[in-house]
A protein has these predicted regions:
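Single conserved hydrophobic/aromatic residue that forms the stacking wall/gate
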Residues: 1-7, 12
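Short, ordered loop/turn segments at secondary-structure junctions
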Residues: 13-15, 21-24, 50-52, 71-74, ...
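Short N-terminal micro-motifs specific to bacterial/archaeal maturation
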Residues: 2, 47, 202-205
Length: 242
C-alpha cells in the first residue's frame, strides 16, 4: 500500500473485502498515514505486525479493523537473527490481547487480533487462542499440502528482499492434502494433521464452547508439559519425541 490511496483503487475495484498493510516498505515514499488509510479505504484494514501492548493500542486507535501479531517466530523467518527484534509469540499475543481489552473499554469497539507465525501444530493454534488471539495465520502447515504451489518448499514474504532478506527458503515436504491437514482424518501423530479437530477437541477438553470462552481458560508456563512421561516417544523418535 503506497502513502497515498491511489495505488489501492484497483483493490477496491476488484471487490477486495480486506486490505492489509502487512510487510510494507517505504521505498522512498512518504510515511504512510495509517489513520487516514483506515478512514478513507472503504474496506476493513488489517495492520501488522506488532508484538507489544503499546503498539497494538496505537494501531487500534488508528482505526485498524484487525491487528496482526508476531515478529520472527515463523518457520522460514530470520528477522530475529537479522534485526535482533522479536518477542516470544505467546507473550506477544497475550500483551496485544490486553491492549485490545483496554481499547474496547476505552472506545466500545472490539478489534480482533491474529497470531501470525510460529504455528506448526494444532496445539500451537490452541495456545494462541488461549492467550487471546481471535484467529491465526499459518504458512508452513499449509505449505506442506499436496496442493500448495511451493511443491514442498516454504519461504517468508521478506525472503526475496534485494536489500535485506529476513527469511529463507525451507523444505517442509508434502504430508497430505489440504483437507487432511485442516480437517483430517489425520495420518500423522504429531498434531500437524486435522488442525481444526485439534482445536475442537482442546476446546471440548477445557469446557470452552466458543472462541471467547477459549480465550478465558487458565494459561500456565510449563516447559515439562511436552516431555513429562514421554521417555519412550523421545527414545524412539515418535509422536511428541520427534
Amino acid at each position: 500500500i503506497p502513502s497515498s490511496l491511489v495505488g489501492s483503487e484497483m483493490c477496491i475495484r476488484d471487490r477486495a473485502t480486506v486490505v492489509s498493510t502487512d510487510h510494507t516498505g517505504p521505498a522512498g515514499q512518504e510515511t504512510l498515514d495509517l489513520e487516514a488509510l483506515c478512514r478513507d479505504m472503504g474496506v476493513p484494514v488489517v495492520i501488522g505486525n506488532c508484538v507489544t501492548y503499546d503498539v497494538a493500542l496505537q494501531l487500534m486507535r488508528a482505526g485498524a479493523a484487525g491487528v496482526m501479531v508476531g515478529i520472527g517466530p515463523g518457520a522460514a523467518c530470520t528477522s530475529r537473527g537479522v534485526l535482533g527484534v522479536g518477542i516470544p509469540q505467546a507473550t506477544a499475543v497475550a500483551d496485544c490481547a490486553a491492549a485490545r481489552a483496554d481499547y474496547e473499554k476505552e472506545s466500545g469497539r472490539y478489534v480482533p487480533i491474529v497470531a501470525d507465525g510460529g504455528i506448526v501444530t494444532g496445539g500451537d493454534i490452541c495456545k494462541c487462542i488461549a492467550c487471546g488471539a481471535d484467529a491465526v495465520m499459518i504458512g508452513s502447515p499449509i505449505a506442506r499440502a499436496e496442493e500448495a504451489p511451493g511443491r514442498g518448499f516454504h519461504w517468508g514474504m521478506a525472503t526475496p528482499s534485494p536489500v535485506l532478506p529476513r527469511g529463507t527458503r525451507i523444505n517442509v515436504g508434502n504430508t497430505g492434502s489440504i483437507e487432511r491437514i485442516l480437517r483430517g482424518p489425520a495420518k500423522l501423530d504429531d498434531g500437524t494433521h486435522n488442525l481444526l479437530g485439534c482445536l475442537k477437541t482442546s476446546m471440548g477438553t477445557l469446557g470452552a464452547q466458543t472462541i471467547k470462552e477459549m480465550q478465558q481458560v487458565e494459561v500456565v508456563v510449563a516447559p515439562s508439559l511436552l516431555t513429562e512421561g514421554k521417555v519412550y516417544q523421545k527414545a524412539q523418535h515418535l509422536g511428541m519425541g520427534k
